[in-house]
């Protein structure tokens, strides 16, 4: 556990009375700079004041801390940036709220969440954006960012410029794809001028309509309509052809799940197009057979695919084709997941399990720890051009301390999230968040 003691001194040599914290005996890992050493980190107010290798005396002549946190050799890294979160406000407060979702994020070491716009009403105008920002200020203990919608509820394109001015980091219709090719091309054109990303839920609904799990052996065994892998790859292929017409635009594939789509992204990157993509832990840890064991808790969109697809996701992470890991945190009320699988809700929660599940790539799949952590911190921040996900003097102190070797069992009953829908209930994992810091303030501490 993280230990601490209190002194009540000020920075010597000045009149600053901001709260100061010294994190000592830490294994500092910063993927953005390649840093990995035992050392210390100092914060003052909301910012990182200094950090470095070796021993640090928090009561020395140069610095006396308001608080000293002994990390006991555990990893201290930048806070996790999750690009794909559904906090459900406004309109879905029975599933999740900004308050409960942000506490779930803090418990998972996630210091920045990027909300998807498929709320009720949709995040398609400045009024809804202002509402979300107000709720974040009132209730959130982590940084809340958001995507704006590409299209309005009436099917017309959103005013992307005004939404960007209101704080949108990019644009997507996640939950559904932008099916209209002309609208997608226009979105690329506007986004190129605004220098923001367009993110796509890659699915051709004409092929997937009515499907509930992957089209394959399991869907046939259960007699369920399946969602074919080409519904994803055809949409990715179409979008990349459109991107060639607007080569300065940035295209991001959300929750990629198939080898076919990944191969298309890999080729586009080699071509020099601005294409990035993300993958969820469930798509690199589980395959379609999980539906037989976990039932509705293993129903999500895109669905769990074949074992070949799952292994290709790991290969994509290893070779850099997949840029980052995101949760697609999709909370649902219990009654929405206890209906028959053919008609229950898609989606699972993921904020509180993101780090340990991602660490399975390090513990079990042979990826370097630096590579795994980069896909949770600096890489997602770069995609949406946020000055977060790294450790540097003067940056906001968003930090996570975690025990790399701690073994524990996932218990959804203990989640801070309002919803408990996860196929990882009862799974033994290794790696536990001990403390989460947002803007210099501790917002979560393990019991």
From Swiss-Prot:
GO biological process, one term: purine nucleobase catabolic process
Residues annotated as binding substrate: 86-88, 118, 301, 332, 346-347
Catalytic residues identified in the record: 328
InterPro entries tied to this protein: Amidohydro-rel, DHOase, DHOase/Allantoinase_Hydrolase, Dihydroorotase_CS, Metal-dep_hydrolase_composite, Metal_Hydrolase
Enzyme class: hydrolase
Recorded catalytic activity of this chain's protein: (S)-dihydroorotate + H2O = N-carbamoyl-L-aspartate + H(+)
Co-factor requirement: Zn(2+)
Gene Ontology terms, MF aspect: allantoinase activity; dihydroorotase activity; zinc ion binding
Protein name: Dihydroorotase
GO cellular component entries: cytoplasm
Sorted UniProt keywords: Hydrolase, Metal-binding, Pyrimidine biosynthesis, Zinc
């Amino acid at each position: 556990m993280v230990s601490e003691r209190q002194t009540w001194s000020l920075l010597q040599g000045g009149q600053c009375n901001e709260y100061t914290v010294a994190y000592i005996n830490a294994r500092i890992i910063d993927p953005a700079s390649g840093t990995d050493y035992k050392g210390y980190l100092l914060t003052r107010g909301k910012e990182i004041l200094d950090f470095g290798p070796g021993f640090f005396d928090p009561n020395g002549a140069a610095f006396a801390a308001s608080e000293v946190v002994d990390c006991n050799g555990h990893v201290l890294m930048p806070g996790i940036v999750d690009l794909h979160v559904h906090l459900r406000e406004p309109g879905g407060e029975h599933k999740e709220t900004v308050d409960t979702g942000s506490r779930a994020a803090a418990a998972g070491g996630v210091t920045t969440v990027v909300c998807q716009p498929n709320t009720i009403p949709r995040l398609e105008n400045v009024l809804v954006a202002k509402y979300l920002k107000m709720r974040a200020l009132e209730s959130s203990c982590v940084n809340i960012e958001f995507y704006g919608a590409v299209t309005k509820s009436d099917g017309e394109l959103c005013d992307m410029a005004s939404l960007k001015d209101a704080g949108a980091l990019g644009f997507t219709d996640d939950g559904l794809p932008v099916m209209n090719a002309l609208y997608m091309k226009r979105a690329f054109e506007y986004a190129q001028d605004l220098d923001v990303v367009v993110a796509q839920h890659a699915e051709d609904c004409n092929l997937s309509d009515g499907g509930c799990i992957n089209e394959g052996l399991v869907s046939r065994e259960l007699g369920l309509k399946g969602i074919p892998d080409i519904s994803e790859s055809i949409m990715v292929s179409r979008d990349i052809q459109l991107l060639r017409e607007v080569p300065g635009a940035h295209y991001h594939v959300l929750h990629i799940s198939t080898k076919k789509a990944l191969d298309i992204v890999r080729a586009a990157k080699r071509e020099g197009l601005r294409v990035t993509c993300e993958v969820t832990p469930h798509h690199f840890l589980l395959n379609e057979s999980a539906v037989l064991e976990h039932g509705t808790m293993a129903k999500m969109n895109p669905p769990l695919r074949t074992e070949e697809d799952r292994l290709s996701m790991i290969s994509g992470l290893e070779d850099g084709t997949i840029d980052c890991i995101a949760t697609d945190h999709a909370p649902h009320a219990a009654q929405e997941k206890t209906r028959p699988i053919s008609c229950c809700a898609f989606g699972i929660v993921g904020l509180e399990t993101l780090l340990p599940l991602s660490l399975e790539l390090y513990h079990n799949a042979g990826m370097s720890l630096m590579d795994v952590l980069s896909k949770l911190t600096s890489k997602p921040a770069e995609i949406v051009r946020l000055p977060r996900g790294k450790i540097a003097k003067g940056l906001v102190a968003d930090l996570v301390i975690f025990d790399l070797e701690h073994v524990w069992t996932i218990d959804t009953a203990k989640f801070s999230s309002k919803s408990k829908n996860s196929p990882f209930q009862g799974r033994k994992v290794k790696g536990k968040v001990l403390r989460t810091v947002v803007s210099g303030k501790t917002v979560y501490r393990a019991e």
